[in-house]
């Protein structure tokens, strides 16, 4: 009875989180007028999950239903951090900065807000994680997921996301060069007949 209800709740939560990620992706795709930038923003979400699992291992807690809810909250914070960074990169590019320069400047400009968001979240949740009362015991797995997930995903936001942005831009430029070569070659071939 209780185990089956717990499994059903877990499955429903995972499905709803997947649906939420798709909706977030769609909204960001419209806002950024891009299909790949929302993917970059969402890349840190799995790292938040990894951080949550590491946090549970470090503190000796088992992953529970409340842990999954903490991962969901963590995903929101992580998406916001990445959104702030990618938006700044795009604005700098619109102002005419070269890609690498825009990546460095955006990292510098958004370093403090991203770090402060993560650290204040982590430090603010420390009292709950160290609470020993019976009432707090059910919250500790959720708080552990949120705090360690945000802390771990912050490094990903500041290092991996700009690197992936650069790689994606390079791949896009490479694809355009191939397309131009193909069209030029096709044009030469059609001139032979």
Please place each PLM-identified region on the residue numbering.
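Interfacial helix-loop-helix hairpins and adjacent transmembrane helices
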Residues: 104, 134-137, 163-193
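Solvent-exposed alpha-helix faces
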Residues: 14, 111-112
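Juxtamembrane "pre-transmembrane" interface segments
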Residues: 1-19, 103, 133-134
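Hydrophobic transmembrane alpha-helices and their membrane-interface caps
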Residues: 23-109, 115-131, 148, 152, ...
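Structured binding elements
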Residues: 138-143
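Active-site phosphate/pyrophosphate-handling residues
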Residues: 4, 83-84, 137
